[in-house]
Amino acid sequence: AELLPNFYKVTHSEHINETDWVVQVMLNPQHAIYNGHFPQQPVVPGVCMLQIIKECIEKIQQAPLQYKQIASCKFLSVINPNETPELKLSLTIKKNETDTFQILAEGVSSKDICIKLKAQLIGK
């Protein structure tokens, strides 16, 4: 289940190879979260980007997951959902013996890299 219903929808998901996926996401610029973040100048909250990435990986793995560790997370550009509602997520997912998933994620909005993430997810 999505933490924020109607915040985004996956429009395309492609399995590139054993560990790599590309997921296209369409943000909903009308979502109520933007009334507070921020009025007249909507910006996707960074924590919501982390949630979108986690939920996309949960769908791919067909299992509930949670962040175990975030080794690095860089927010490189602001996403205004009115101007650039489409996101492209490049995901590398490697499963360890311990049921931990090593994640490399990069999000691109209108040709600008908006997030780079290196993290570990683990089953709930």
Describe every region a protein language model picked out.
Residues 18-22, 48, 86-88, 102, ...:
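Intrinsic-disorder/low-complexity, polar/charged segments enriched in Ser/Thr/Lys/Arg/Asp/Glu/Gln
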